[in-house]
Amino acid sequence: VRICGKSVGEPSPTKCIRQKMGFISENRKEFGLALNLPIRVNVTHAGLKEIFPSGIVDVKKERRLAEEYRQKLRIATPDIERNVVSLSGGNQQKVVLAKWLSTNSEFLVFDEPTRGIDVGAKEEIHRLIDELARQGVGILMISSDLPEVLTLSDRIYVMREGQIVKEIETVTAETTQEEIIAYATGGDRSDA
């Protein structure tokens, strides 16, 4: 695995965090959150070494950071001490994003970023992804939601059976869902 041209060997969560990478899983409940812990803890736990280099958690600093991300990402909750399990799916997804932003991630992998969230939350996540990209954060989005792919992507890699079969270098108004489906299924591109 190479990150920014440097070989990092076998990836691990620690190596990825050290390389300023974050991963927003499609299964936030299993791989992204500690559901029975407060929002405050979920926001800071991936970056404990960076946020608290002494190894001692400064709860006031932790609260300030969590509150900053609650406001910045518009996480709908009156209290960062609430357990994440009490939040809606869209707000849980924002907590996962806040966790990785608190580590100063320069590259984020979004795996099905809006699966299982309502339309309003979906639009908010799209806005956040777009804003991060404009700020220079590298974004790799894996999605089966083709309208989402077409809306948010500058470049699309179409895969079939684990292999890249097409690179669409510039996404334009002429790029269609049918074209992507044709490449993904091995269909005739002229049908698109």
Question: What do the PLM-derived regions correspond to, one by one?
Answer:
Residues 1-192:
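Glycine-rich phosphate-binding loops of nucleotide-dependent enzymes
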